[in-house]
């Protein structure tokens, strides 16, 4: 992760150097104050006092300039570092496969991208300003104390190690606790995201109370951990103040004895107390630095864990091999394919075999959890088969570069997802170079042209994030049109017409069949009516293929398909 600081090496060096320069000027302030008391006030020399006060103002002004310069460089380095790290993390996440995304979870990745990197940025900013300054002032104040009075300076030698034990002891104890607290924060964020995403379902089933209880339980665990860490961290300040105040009392006692015997002047005592106060201030800063850096290191470790996660699948740089002549007509071929998700106890698909020819329409039907989405997710290689082989257009799916495979296979997901922008910008996801004529052709096929024309701005009509200003059916038709803009060779509709009425659904299927070329269409649907005219229908039950054939044949040979069909049409044969 430190490589992201390479572009800011100059700032990372100059920030602590200017802070040390500021600290150097601060260390001379007590000596000047001692001179004012020992010489100016004792001799009633007003001119001497004014000159020394001018020196104090000059030291303060130069110190302020150094401090502002250091702040500028540290902020520039920290912000630049976090920006580079955030870009790298986002780019890495884009390369991760569905398996890794499923394992880590969306809420976890959002936390890494936002609060974790912000914490790293704050920690780095503080570190660059204080990691040299605070120790330098602590050691420098002790050295300067020896120049004032050796006997009194030994109090510093005793106080500083005691303070260090307190500060570093708290750090060692709290560092692992911060990691636990952050993990519990992830849990709270995950529950929040899940609840807000499914708020309609929660209210539809009157589950607000149970969701509140679940959130309060997770939030209570987080609160208790944060309080536990806070209680331990809060010990640092009183313990350090007790040690410092005892040291000041000792200084005053030793100073009074030394003054009585003529070993030091009263101004020297003031200088020593000032040095002790400087040590107190810097150790408080150092304690805060350690706490913040501990948090930042914990967050950095979590970000690094994501960066260390390698994609589970690799794509070749170029297309491998030629499609065998005997498979030239194949669009998709599954050969004894099984799929088990990472961490799952049982396979989601078992021993699936079929061949879809170019230009065919393939229906996929089955009950909830039967493996329909799992099957079609293997075609664009969102996941790799655990067993068996998946061939696309005559070649193994692993032979295709990512762009080539995703360009040949277009998927319309179950959940219609649109992005903030315009209708045009969303459609151009399919092909950024598509002309307006191509966009309108795709809209016509997707049965979306009429409602887009009815919009005041047509293709330039704004689309809110997630398509909130569109109905469910409109969003589904636009996502289908977006897939068609890319002119794929294989189109997968994963239950993506569920919000369409029967007439629009039928018109969509008719328009897809009329498209030129050999477009192979996979239609995943709960409606048997949507699949009646498919060239082949795959019937799934509990991850196994229990039927394969045309509609009429399956009614005779596949009890599962017959049951699905009967459950949908026994009350309304007019829908056949």
Regions found by a protein language model. Name each.
Residues 7-10, 95-99, 115-128, 132, ...:
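An intracellular "coupling" helix at the cytosolic face of ABC transporter transmembrane type-1 domains
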Residues 44-51, 144-158, 228-302, 306-307:
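Helix-loop-helix
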Residues 17, 25-29, 54, 66, ...:
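Hydrophobic alpha-helical transmembrane segments of ABC transporter permease domains
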Residues 325-576:
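ABC-type nucleotide-binding domain
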Residues 43-44, 79, 87-111, 115-117, ...:
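Short intracellular "coupling" helices and adjacent cytoplasmic loop segments at the cytosolic face
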